[in-house]
Amino acid sequence: MIIKAPIKLIGNNGSPYTRKMVALLRYKHIPYKIIWGEPDEYLDRNNIEKPKPVLHPTFLFENSEKKITAVTDSTPIIRKLESKFMSRSTIPSNSVLRFLNYLLEDYGDEWGTKFMFHYRWHDDKDIDNAGTLLPLYANSTLTNEELSHKKEKIAQRQLGRVWVVGSNKKTAPLIDKCFKKIISILEDHFINFPFLLGSRPSSADFAFFGQLSQLVGFDPTPRSIIEKNSMRTMAWVGKTEDLSGLEPDSEDWISDSKLPETVKRIFCEVGKTYVPTMLKNEEAFNSGEEKWSAEILGREWEQRTFPYQVKCLKWIRDEFRSLVDKDQQKVLDLLKDTDCERILN
């Protein structure tokens, strides 16, 4: 795969992963061209083979034969970009911090999207808001008839996918509780640190930003929750949108000798919520079960088995196993009593 500037991608402002990647490109000073619209439609028009699945954003790279290849999945794309554009790195050079960043990025992408997707498609006012805005973000000149048709179509499609994130009547109170907890931790964290792992942004920051860009700037219900509980998080989202003027330094990362108290609390939240669901999902997948349940913070979490997150768990373990023994032990020491250690076996 040939990666060269300007980077071309297809996205939608209502997509957390589009916002994640565009903000990262801005920070890294990587020229880009974004096509606002539906990847499906663009790829069909241009006879480009579709990735599986087709997602926002879809990146367009050249292969060795100079044919355009459509690529999705933000985490590996970031690593490819970092290998080509090495300045202003979002990946810590310290191997211990690099793993911690990977784990937080995965949490932001995979658990954070449960908040976003749940709030967007749970209450009528949020459903109406998303059903209207998402088609208009792709094409603001739709006729009212076209908009009505696309609104109904997208709402039906997305409401049929809420099982992916585990959003249902049983889990709704727990999702709400977890969301309020993590933003309360972020409120405390941003008193002392401008970013998750110090004074410069990591790829984990952009993962958190992607989901929060929607929770703050798109969906009415979570925005009202953040306004009441964490104005620092709201301000952080506004700032992280464009960090092109930030001048990072190699000393801006936190130390790997001891985690700041608020960072440890974030990992405790990861360990209490994301970790048990990942382990149960893996167990169900390996047993051929279509659904599973787990106890999270004293409540039952129930959802259908999600094969992609089995891959996510494997990749986390691969990252951990790539560390030398002493760094593996340092990670385990830093994560002691967070319950995150459970996924590293």
Where are these regions (language model features)?
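GST superfamily/GST-like fold recognition
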Residues: 196-216
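Active-site/pore-lining binding-face segments in mid-to-C-terminal subdomains
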Residues: 209-299
